[in-house]
Design a protein with these regions (language model features):
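NAD(P)-cofactor binding segment of oxidoreductase domains
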Residues: 63-103, 140
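Catalytic helix-loop patch of NAD(P)-dependent Rossmann-fold dehydrogenases
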Residues: 115-156
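Glycine/proline-rich active-site loop of Rossmann-fold NAD(P)-dependent oxidoreductases
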Residues: 136, 150-152, 162-173, 178, ...
Length: 281
């Protein structure tokens, strides 16, 4: 198995290293020479390039699968739509004819639900903000490109809020400093631990999924106050400081029953009570 990874960040790098451990051949796109050297030391073949520079993508190899997990780097001073949509178009125009399978990592921000109702793969997408619309537009690019290519398959995975080791740093500082935490305390949070993201991505990469779209979230949405209270308990800090003003935004609750049923996934961290203790460093 040869996998090409576009977006070797929090999720992509972990996937790459585990793929190497499985004996897979792994190639990853990176923008910097220093990063390329680190990837090479980990057994990953680097290709230096940028999704916004089409000529730099010509060196991307033929592979069995592409995992596309590009995140938005605010420090890069690049437009989010350019990165998510134009960059995706650039990559797919280069690889779609020679890499038969794509796993595209998207976001549950494509749903605009704010009343606390449940959403799943069948729920109409009505993004509430520009970020969600950009993610939805990127999904449309994937569907359009792969609909034109026979014997080519694309799977879109919409992730809820990612957490895990190294992803709770800002939250820890807020709690320890007793700084007010924004958002409706009674609003719903939907989370997925990085261990479960990796588990699902490897299942998708190793088999032939029956659906082209999956939503991935843990088994129990939590009220915002509940999440921060659980985190505070494990950090041994005072209870979270939350705003008192009423809010009409209760968010959404994500139902990931399809992915658990169709792929036979048994989540490693099905609730925050399982995931937070293994995420605190």
């Amino acid at each position: 198995m040869h996998v090409l990874i576009i977006g070797c960040g929090y999720v992509g790098e972990r996937f790459a290293k585990q793929a190497v451990e499985r004996g897979w051949q792994v190639t990853a796109l990176t923008r910097s020479q220093k990063r390329a050297e680190a990837l090479q030391l980990a057994g990953i073949r680097p290709v230096i390039g940028n999704v916004l520079e089409p000529k730099s993508l010509q060196a991307l190899p033929q592979a069995d699968l592409c995992l596309y997990a590009v995140g938005y780097d605010r420090s890069a001073n690049e437009n989010k739509r350019d990165v998510y949509v134009s960059g995706l178009k650039n990559v797919l125009s280069e690889i779609a004819d020679r890499i038969p399978r794509l796993i595209y990592v998207s976001s549950t921000s494509v749903y605009g639900e704010s009343t606390g109702d449940w959403v799943n793969e069948e729920t109409p997408c009505e993004p509430a903000n520009e970020s969600g619309q950009i993610c939805l537009d990127a999904e449309a690019v994937v569907n359009e490109v792969y609909a034109r290519n026979l014997n080519r398959d694309a799977t879109i995975v919409r992730l809820s809020g990612i957490y895990g080791p190294g992803r709770l740093i800002g939250r820890k500082e807020q709690l320890r400093g007793q700084k007010p935490i924004s958002g409706n305390p009674d609003g719903w949070l939907n989370l997925i631990h990085v261990d479960d993201i990796l588990q699902v991505l490897f299942i998708l990469a190793s088999g032939t999924p029956s659906s082209s779209l999956y939503l991935l979230s843990d088994e129990r949405p939590n009220r915002r106050f509940e999440f921060y209270s659980e985190l505070a308990k494990h950090l041994q800090t005072p209870a979270p400081v939350m705003p008192d003003e009423p809010s009409a935004d209760f968010g959404k609750r994500c139902d990931s029953l399809r992915i658990r049923n169709e792929l036979g996934v048994k989540l490693l961290r099905p609730t925050i009570q399982d995931g937070i203790p293994v995420s605190i460093e």
